[in-house]
Amino acid sequence: MFGDRQRPMVLVLGLGESGLAIARWCARHGCRLRIADTRETPPNLAALTAAGIDAEFVGGAFSPALIDGGIELVALSPGLSPLAEDLAPLVAAARERGIPVWGELEFFAQALTTLGANGYAPKVIAITGTNGKTTTTSLAGLLCERAGKTVAVAGNISPAMLDKLTEAIDAAALPDVWVLELSSFQLDTAHTFAPDAATILNITQDHLDWHGGFAAYAAAKGRIFGPRTVRVLNRDDAEVMKFAPPAAAADAPRAITFGLNEPAADGDYGLLRENGIAWLVEAVDRDAADAPATPSRRRKQEAANPPDIALKRLMPADALRIRGLHNAANALAAYALARAIDLPAAPLLHGLREYRGEPHRVEVIATLDGVDYVDDSKGTNVGATVAALDGLAQRAVLIAGGDGKGQDFEPLAAPVARWCRAVMLIGRDAPALREALADTGVPLADHATLESAVRAAGALAQPGDAVLLSPACASLDMFRNYAHRADVFRSAVEDIALEKGTTL
């Protein structure tokens, strides 16, 4: 369970959901534990005690002294940046002493390796990206279920991977398929993780403060791929396509692409627009033999004789219940992942039609006097808001602002100029947003509260428009979390509905 170490003494840094899961897992397998948190009484300390875990707890600032006294393994919670001023010296000291630094994902990967020695061989699907992870993960899990597999969905989406694995072991019900949503934080401390199929949906600026820069952030995303992982890549994203294997490499892993244009290579996915209808399609080689070639042989064959590609219609895009072109891309990614582990197409297509989406992700909560009120409170970065505006493809009054996390807001200018009737600015970084959008020609208005912004947006919107809450920012400057921000938005829309003599 712990590589070449038997019941090591483990230092767990951070007692959030993931840290608590690691502590439970290590205690279950006989490890001695020291747990440290910068908070003197973290909320999960009571849960640790209730679980009967015998651990030394140290509250307060981190220091290298925490690894003294026989620590053999350091477990790092995903919320803690290894670059943080109080943590970097500790991590450096651990590495100097040859002490491994793992995150929960590495513990999970090591556990699967151990279970594999006893015959457990599940398929593992992994999803990362700046935006769309939760939607694609939930959808991929549903598709695998519709194909008749037992499925466990875990990771960044919650529950923690180790908690889900413990539950499955205790129930003697290990799943056929694991579908994991993984953040850059979780991937940063993974070393041996090697899923069967994985996707990077997109890479745009986010968490730059945590990683120290965009290059490090993108590199962390790339750690999702093992040596033989089928790579499902967004061909519309140049940063993602940097992870495409070299075409000439004989031992390169298989790669599949998806995008919002017509696919041109056998096995890729995309959109075909024909007679006013957008279709989800798969590119197929008309001349392909019945017996599939290996990826390396297929590349050699295609280099010598370019395939004659036909586009196989899968379903109309408007048959999806999730709105927006970005969600069509998410659907293609989920379908490609399921097909990459050899699941049959027919039940997957039924699942695509069935999926209703996740809350706070371009969710239409009301239509009042012809105006859609759209909750995209989970849109906590610039890329998410760009995707929401382009995906809805309708005139909108945008509500944006909050804690910008050091992002560059300039990429918002073009979609705002194209789609927005006006922008309501809220939160701490409203001035930075105003500066980035100043030359768009779109009216900008500052509001002290979200309620005020919603009311003003509703007054400006015309029938056929959307009032879109897609802040491009984190919420903690004004709200408890993004769900609280969404609740305030919904409440404000409910007030407008009541004034119009209706309810949501």
Curated annotation (Swiss-Prot):
The residues that cross the membrane are: none
> Where's it found, cell-wise?
Cytoplasm
Q: Which residues bind ATP?
A: G129, T130, N131, G132, K133, T134, T135
Example GO biological process: regulation of cell shape
Alphabetically ordered keywords of this record:
ATP-binding, Cell cycle, Cell division, Cell shape, Cell wall biogenesis/degradation, Cytoplasm, Ligase, Nucleotide-binding, Peptidoglycan synthesis
Primary localization: cytoplasm
What EC number(s) does this enzyme carry?
A: 6.3.2.9
Which InterPro entries is this protein grouped with?
Answer: Mur-like_cat_sf, Mur_ligase_C, Mur_ligase_C_dom_sf, Mur_ligase_cen, MurD
Might you report a single GO cellular component term? cytoplasm
Q: What cystine linkages occur within this chain?
A: none
Q: Which SUPFAM superfamilies match?
A: MurCD N-terminal domain, MurD-like peptide ligases, catalytic domain, MurD-like peptide ligases, peptide-binding domain
Q: Part of which pathway? A: Cell wall biogenesis; peptidoglycan biosynthesis
The question of whether Ligase is a record keyword is answered with yes
- Give one GO molecular function term: ATP binding
* Alphabetical list of Gene3D superfamilies matching this protein: Mur ligase, C-terminal domain, Mur-like, catalytic domain, NAD(P)-binding Rossmann-like Domain
Which reaction is this enzyme known to catalyze?
Answer: UDP-N-acetyl-alpha-D-muramoyl-L-alanine + D-glutamate + ATP = UDP-N-acetyl-alpha-D-muramoyl-L-alanyl-D-glutamate + ADP + phosphate + H(+)
UniProt family annotation:
Belongs to the MurCDEF family.
What biological function has been recorded for the protein in this entry? Cell wall formation. Catalyzes the addition of glutamate to the nucleotide precursor UDP-N-acetylmuramoyl-L-alanine (UMA).
Name of the protein this chain belongs to: UDP-N-acetylmuramoylalanine--D-glutamate ligase
Upper lineage is: Bacteria, Pseudomonadati, Pseudomonadota, Betaproteobacteria, Burkholderiales
Gene, per the UniProt record: murD
